[in-house]
């Protein structure tokens, strides 16, 4: 899993994410809807236009959930259990979408963190987001 150094890199970078939760989350969702239009099917009831209040609110929910995971990196299963249940049993989201959103979140991080999104930070976040995606997909097995 994540080394102690990688966890520190994630926590340090998260300090910048924390102050822009709604913006980063909305941008990641908008990117996902643009690059992977098939993901829109789960949001048929949303206004999917740029800057939509629904996308901004949901984007913030996504980033708040990631923040919970950031602060519970040693026990992601417990931290994300309810969210995993919701997506598997109620929303029935195809688990591949977690990986698609993770990729879009990487792009958002790289764009906003600039040089601070070093190769080491990228690797740490890649491992972290892959672990989050795996935990969210646990209930599908």
Swiss-Prot record:
Involved in oxygen transport from the lung to the various peripheral tissues. PROSITE patterns: GLOBIN. It holds the Pfam family Globin. Belongs to the globin family. Heterotetramer of two alpha-D chains and two beta chains. This is Hemoglobin subunit alpha-D. Gene3D superfamilies: Globins. Residues 1-141 form the Globin domain. It comes from the Eukaryota. Heme b binds at residues 58, 87. The keyword Heme applies. GO terms for molecular function: haptoglobin binding; heme binding; metal ion binding; organic acid binding; oxygen binding; oxygen carrier activity; peroxidase activity. GO terms for cellular component: blood microparticle; haptoglobin-hemoglobin complex; hemoglobin complex. CDD domains: Hb-alpha-like. One of its GO terms (biological process) is hydrogen peroxide catabolic process. Red blood cells. Keywords: Heme, Iron, Metal-binding, Oxygen transport, Transport.
């Amino acid at each position: 899993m994540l080394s102690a150094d990688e966890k520190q890199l994630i926590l340090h970078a998260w300090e910048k994410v924390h102050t822009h939760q709604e913006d980063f989350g909305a941008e990641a969702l908008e990117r996902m809807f643009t690059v992977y239009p098939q993901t829109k099917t789960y949001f048929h009831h949303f206004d999917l236009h740029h800057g939509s209040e629904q996308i901004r609110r949901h984007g913030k929910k996504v980033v708040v959930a990631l923040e919970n995971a950031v602060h519970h990196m040693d026990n992601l299963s417990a931290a994300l259990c309810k969210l995993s249940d919701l997506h598997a049993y109620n929303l029935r989201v195809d688990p591949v979408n977690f990986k698609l959103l993770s990729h879009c979140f990487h792009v958002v991080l790289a764009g906003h963190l600039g040089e601070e999104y070093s190769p080491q930070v990228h690797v740490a976040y890649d491992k972290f987001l892959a672990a989050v995606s795996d935990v969210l997909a646990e209930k599908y097995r």
